[in-house]
């Protein structure tokens, strides 16, 4: 990506590089205000949450789907077959929201209940099937450069390496691998999971990531709408810093004031 304002995924263009999740908020009002403050255009929706919702507080009815692009996710799936089934349901949910041509899916296959780390083998299997079914697949993966390239070659629309475990707020723990993924990728790289504060979102963008996806850092903040706004600023600042280009690191000091031709 060569400018801030253009993020292209699956043939669709977005002006924001911040994706936001819809889970874990204390109230629907917090969620709606946070989405607005974030300036996001893509929001993730857990298909299982919608499918099993018995409260009457239907997420599909709370969000303006003319403003936001739905990214259904397969959270809760433990194998490829299950993920494919949930992805199909997600596509139907998108149609119900009025997005008839929405084939996006955030692919999550997570059998590990303690650390919530994605299964690379089942993720590849599910991605192969979903791509053949016409989905724009956005796979959630460990920060593994080889796996990221393999999924890109399969036809995934992005790769989404984790910064650190979901909801941990530990930030970017594997900078070297994330940097390699960014360097090698020919599809957008979206950093997903573990970001806790705006400075970490900015750091991801400064590395050259094309975007970030954030949920817990916003939803579980003391003031979610304010945190959403702060992270929005962090993402924009990080992207601009990447485009501007940082100075080279040196092992010694270099004076910023001229030392010659100064009359005293």
UniProtKB/Swiss-Prot annotation:
Catalytic activity: [ThiS sulfur-carrier protein]-C-terminal-Gly-aminoethanethioate + 2-iminoacetate + 1-deoxy-D-xylulose 5-phosphate = [ThiS sulfur-carrier protein]-C-terminal Gly-Gly + 2-[(2R,5Z)-2-carboxy-4-methylthiazol-5(2H)-ylidene]ethyl phosphate + 2 H2O + H(+)
Biochemical pathway: Cofactor biosynthesis; thiamine diphosphate biosynthesis
Residues binding 1-deoxy-D-xylulose 5-phosphate, per UniProt: 167, 193-194, 215-216
Gene that encodes the chain: thiG1
Similarity comment: Belongs to the ThiG family.
EC category name: transferase
Subunit structure: Homotetramer. Forms heterodimers with either ThiH or ThiS.
GO cellular component terms given for this protein: cytoplasm
EC number(s) from the headed UniProt entry: 2.8.1.10
Keyword Cytoplasm: yes
Protein's GO biological process: thiamine diphosphate biosynthetic process
Entry coiled-coil feature ranges: none
InterPro entries the UniProt entry points to: Aldolase_TIM, Thiazole_synthase_ThiG, ThiG
Subcellular location: Cytoplasm
Pfam families the UniProt entry points to: ThiG (PF05690)
Residues at the catalytic site: 106
Keyword Membrane found: no
UniProt superkingdom: Bacteria
Primary site of residence: cytoplasm
Function statement: Catalyzes the rearrangement of 1-deoxy-D-xylulose 5-phosphate (DXP) to produce the thiazole phosphate moiety of thiamine. Sulfur is provided by the thiocarboxylate moiety of the carrier protein ThiS. In vitro, sulfur can be provided by H(2)S.
Entry keywords, A to Z: Cytoplasm, Schiff base, Thiamine biosynthesis, Transferase
Name recorded for this polypeptide: Thiazole synthase
An MF annotation (GO) of this entry: thiazole synthase activity
């Amino acid at each position: 990506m060569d400018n801030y304002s253009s993020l292209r995924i699956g043939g669709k263009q977005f002006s924001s590089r911040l994706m936001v999740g819809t889970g874990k908020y204390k109230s629907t009002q917090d969620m709606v205000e946070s989405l607005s403050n974030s300036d996001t255009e893509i929001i993730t929706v857990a298909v299982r949450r919608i499918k099993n919702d018995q409260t009457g507080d239907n997420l599909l009815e709370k969000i303006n789907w003319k403003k936001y692009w739905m990214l259904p996710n397969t959270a809760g799936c433990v194998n490829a077959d299950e993920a494919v089934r949930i992805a199909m349901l997600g596509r139907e949910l998108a149609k119900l929201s009025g997005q008839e041509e929405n084939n996006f899916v955030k692919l999550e296959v997570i059998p590990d209940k303690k650390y919530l780390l994605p299964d690379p083998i089942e993720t590849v299997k599910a991605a192969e099937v979903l791509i053949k079914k016409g989905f724009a697949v956005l796979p959630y993966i460990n920060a593994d450069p080889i796996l990221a390239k393999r999924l890109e070659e399969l036809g995934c629309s992005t790769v989404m390496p984790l910064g650190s475990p979901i909801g941990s707020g530990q930030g970017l723990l594997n900078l070297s691998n994330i940097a390699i993924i960014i360097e090698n990728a020919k599809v957008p790289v979206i950093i997903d999971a573990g970001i806790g504060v705006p400075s970490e979102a900015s750091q991801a963008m400064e590395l050259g990531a094309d975007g970030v996806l954030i949920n817990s850092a916003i939803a579980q903040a003391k003031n979610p709408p304010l945190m959403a706004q702060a992270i929005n600023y962090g993402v924009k600042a990080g992207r601009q810093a990447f485009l501007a280009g940082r100075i080279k690191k040196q092992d010694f000091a270099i004076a910023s004031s001229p030392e010659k031709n100064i009359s005293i």
